[in-house]
UniProtKB/Swiss-Prot annotation:
Residues 7-133 form the MATH domain. PROSITE patterns: MATH (PS50144). PANTHER family: MATH DOMAIN-CONTAINING PROTEIN, TRAF-LIKE SUPERFAMILY PROTEIN. Residues 259-312 form a coiled coil. SMART domains: MATH. Keywords: Coiled coil. InterPro entries: MATH-CC_domain_protein, MATH/TRAF_dom, TRAF-like. This is MATH domain and coiled-coil domain-containing protein At3g58370.
Length: 326
């Protein structure tokens, strides 16, 4: 297996994929945003389905201090080596901690599609996977100090200093720094301003009982909230059960800080209902299509039968000639 680490991306090349004998495999550890990670894959599928399962996992978690946490917005991509348009990409945001070391997708791509000849996912026995972490916030010690990092990554980090006080740093001084803007007491990125303003306009009192005073923790809560909203804006059929379970956990986490999210809970319930409706509707459509195929086949058989009967009738319905009678 080969790997390559560039900025906030890590590429994992799995060689001899078709002949792997292991039920699960791990990438080499890599560092993004001062944190160690590795990828976990199930090349033969898991017990729930016949698809490649893929996860981002915290590496060497036992070495981390008590109470550590990480929030990451990340994507996992199965590269199509013939055309990028067919690459299979999934996005997630998740809190990682001692009880939740990994997050990802149980059904990244169906194994028949992955192994299909000339499909572009398995080329010369190799499968290429890319993980990209676009937003990272850390509570606890970093795995790797800023001085020892070789990459310049514009990732956000929250960490505890030696006195367990919360401080905010960019990855290093050469990294581009995004200036934050105050919106109703929350420091947010320029790209988030309009979204946060819209939330306050529609729900003016939703943060009236918000308890945390530290501006970095407040930013963390708002980031989680915006991630939740982004999740709910996806097509229901694109959301997995894991996505919705994590969304429910995230809602509880944010509400514990004092934010009133009854409006978001209703939307989450609505999305869950829509997803269920889509799933049951697709099942009904599939059954209807199968029945239609059977009916079409029956129609073809009846048409052939009618043609044969018409031919037999036409053949029999011929008068005898004088010569035939005599």
């Amino acid at each position: 297996m080969e790997s390559e680490e560039v900025d906030n991306k890590f590429t994992w090349v799995i060689k001899n994929f078709s002949t792997l004998q292991y039920d699960k495999i791990y990438s080499d550890p890599f560092v993004i945003g001062g944190c160690k990670w590795h990828l976990l894959a199930y090349p033969k599928g898991n017990k729930f389905n016949n698809s490649l399962s893929l996860y981002l996992v915290v590496d060497d978690a036992r070495a981390l201090p008590c109470g550590w946490r990480r929030y990451a917005q990340f994507s996992l991509t199965i590269i199509n080596q013939l055309t990028d348009k067919l690459s299979q990409r999934g996005e997630k945001q998740n809190w990682f901690n001692q009880r939740n070391l990994g997050s990802g997708f149980t059904s990244m791509i169906p194994l028949p599609n992955l192994h299909a000849k000339n499909a572009g996912y398995l080329v010369n026995g190799e499968v290429k996977i890319v993980v990209e972490i676009n937003d990272l916030e850390v509570i606890g010690k970093l795995d790797v100090s800023e001085e020892s990092e070789e990459t310049n990554q514009p990732l956000k980090k929250i960490k505890l200093d030696d006195n367990d006080a919360v401080s905010f740093d960019s990855l290093n001084e050469t990294s581009p720094v995004k200036e934050s803007i105050d919106v109703n007491g929350f420091q947010v990125l320029p790209s988030q301003v309009e979204s946060v303003k819209c939330i306050f306009e529609r729900h003016p009192d939703f943060a009236s009982k918000f308890r945390p005073k530290n501006r970095h923790l407040k930013s963390t809560y708002m980031t989680v909230l915006l991630g939740l909203i982004k999740t709910l804006c996806q097509l229901p059929e694109e959301l997995t059960d894991d996505d919705l379970d994590e969304a429910s956990v995230a809602v509880s986490y944010v509400e514990n800080g004092g934010l009133r999210l009854d409006w978001l809970e209703k939307k989450l319930a609505e999305v869950k209902a829509k997803k269920k409706k889509v799933e049951t509707g697709k099942a009904r459509l599939q059954r209807a299509e199968e029945e239609l195929q059977k009916l079409n086949q029956k129609c073809l058989e009846l048409k052939a039968f009618l043609e044969k009967e018409n031919a037999d009738v036409s053949e029999a319905n011929v008068p005898l000639s004088f010569e035939d009678v005599v």
